[in-house]
Curated annotation (Swiss-Prot):
Its cofactor is Zn(2+). It comes from Crotalus durissus collilineatus (Brazilian rattlesnake). This is Zinc metalloproteinase/disintegrin. Residues 397-478 form the Disintegrin domain. Residues 21-187, 390-408, 474-478 form a propeptide. Keywords: Cell adhesion impairing toxin, Collagen degradation, Disulfide bond, Hemorrhagic toxin, Hemostasis impairing toxin, Hydrolase, Metal-binding, Metalloprotease, Protease, Secreted, Signal, Toxin, Zinc, Zymogen. GO terms for molecular function: metal ion binding; metalloendopeptidase activity; toxin activity. Residues 193-389 form the Peptidase M12B domain. Transmembrane segments: none annotated. Its EC number is 3.4.24.-.
């Protein structure tokens, strides 16, 4: 019988308040410092996993005790999740690190039906939670040990600049039909759709974070964790298929004109990424300051299209919640959702698809967004999001700690008897093109057009490319 592990964090008797502090999230006015102390209640003889499936924390916020319930976001990563970076001489280096025992959670506050939470427990607690209608940020204090945390309202973070931030999509949605309530859609798990995304980080981002790939990786993971929560009630399941960091140089011309960058990124994605990575949608995360007030742009209704199923987003805030909701906004354009108008409403201060990004962003879609998204899905029938993500790359690449592997690994070197792969060097044997994969047969790529995965919903079976051992997910019938 599987027993749920209960973890309680008790606070020291005297948490204190401060008036101003500089944190990773920015300059903060009015914050509390709390001192978590972990108390674990385990069955006798049980071994504590590094990151439990379910956790519970007791916190004091504004002097009042609250209980935070957390559950690991098990669907955060695709099973063939990969990470790619580039060596100084331009070599592409790809690894498949294990992400099953990750540290990213969703949750709620006890006795608060409207509460939400997205938390990283990798190094202390970092993330946000909604309590009694207010959004709070929690993060470890970097200048002390991991038990010291700051808790503060999002509204208490000083603005990084006064200029309003806008989406670059200018196409407006107009309809003479009255907006129905989202509940009239009768959405249920049978409507579930699945979107596998790849996040590409440009060279400016790599420089902005001082070449720290671990920091970039964790930031992307935290933001996709937030995205996944936002789409939950839309019955759209988001998973991260991979991260690519342009650590050597940009592979496209990243420029302040957002539409031009979007066009270039789409062209690169079409000719490069699908050949080596199964995914439904790709995003460029950039440090560049786009012209005007734009912080993101995307193609409307382009999901599953091999070229325009893309979006570009500026890393415009130190607070990952704000950038994550911009990423959600732009992906929603790909899913056929337009900007909200005055007749649209949600349960937040503002809605995700507002054309102007609020300083207090909402994690809620409007009634209009629900209708537009599912009208698009039902009418346009994008095929790539019908299939629940499956493992398409069975290679388990060894990694050292959290570092990206610095040597090229061509095959799974787990078996000495593998006729395609040298066990000692993880290199393919002479004459071998592959060692494993749905499009690999006797160490050779299967011919182009060979069916590798039969479609259960239409006649668009997935076929081999003749250039890879992977069975690519069909993206040509959106």
């Amino acid at each position: 019988m599987i027993q749920v592990l209960l973890v309680t964090i008790c606070l020291a008797a005297f948490p204190y308040q401060g008036s101003s502090i500089i944190l990773e999230s920015g300059n903060v006015n009015d914050y509390e410092v709390i001192y978590p102390r972990k108390v674990t209640a385990l069955p006798k003889g049980a071994v504590q996993p590094k990151y439990e499936d379910t956790m519970q924390y007791e916190l004091k916020v504004n002097g009042q005790p609250v209980v935070l319930h957390l559950e690991k976001n098990k669907g955060l990563f695709s099973k063939d999740y990969s990470e790619t970076h580039y060596s100084p001489d331009g070599r592409k280096i790809t690894t498949n690190p294990s992400v099953e025992d990750h540290c990213y959670y969703h949750g709620r506050i006890e006795n608060d039906a409207d509460s939400t939470a997205s938390i990283s427990a990798c190094n202390g607690l970092k993330g946000h939670f909604k309590l009694q209608g207010e959004m709070y940020i929690i993060e470890p204090l970097e200048l002390s040990d991991s038990e010291d945390h700051a808790v503060f309202k999002l509204e208490n973070v000083e603005k990084e600049d006064e200029a309003p931030k806008m989406c670059g999509v200018t196409q407006n949605w107009e309809s003479n039909e009255p907006i129905k309530k989202a509940s009239h859609l009768n959405l249920n798990p049978e409507h579930q759709r699945y979107v596998e995304i790849v996040i590409v980080v440009d060279h400016g981002m790599f420089t902005k974070y001082n070449g720290d790939s671990d920091k970039i990786r964790q930031r992307v993971h935290q933001m996709v964790n937030i995205m996944k929560e936002s789409y939950r009630y839309m019955y759209i399941d988001i998973s991260l298929a991979g991260i690519e960091i342009w650590s050597n140089k940009d592979l496209i011309n990243v420029q302040p004109a957002a539409p031009n960058t979007l066009k270039s990124f789409g062209e690169w994605r079409e000719t490069d990424l699908p050949k080596r990575k199964s995914h439904d949608n790709a995003q460029l995360l950039t440090s560049i300051d786009f012209n005007g007030q734009t912080i993101g742009i995307a193609n409307i209704g382009a999901i599953c299209d091999p070229k325009p199923s893309t979006r570009v987003v500026q890393d415009h805030s130190k607070i990952n919640l704000r950038v994550a909701l911009t990423m959600t906004h732009e992906l929603s354009h790909n899913l056929g959702i337009h900007h909200d108008t005055g007749s649209c409403s949600c349960s937040g201060y503002s809605c995700i698809m507002s054309p102007v990004i609020s300083d207090e962003p909402s994690k809620y879609f409007s009634d209009c967004s629900y209708i537009q998204c599912w009208n698009f899905i039902m009418n346009q029938k994008p095929q790539c999001i019908l299939k629940k993500p499956l493992r398409t790359d069975t290679v388990s690449t060894p990694v050292s700690g959290n570092e990206l592997l610095e040597a090229r690994i061509e095959c799974d070197c787990g078996s000495i008897e593998n006729p395609c792969c040298y066990a000692t060097t993880c290199k393919l044997r002479p004459g071998s093109q592959c060692a494993e994969g749905m499009c690999c047969d006797q160490c050779r790529f299967m011919k182009k057009g060979t069916v590798c995965r039969v479609s259960l919903v239409n006649k668009n079976d997935d076929t081999c490319t003749g250039q890879s051992a992977d069975c690519p997910r069909n993206v040509l019938y959106g």
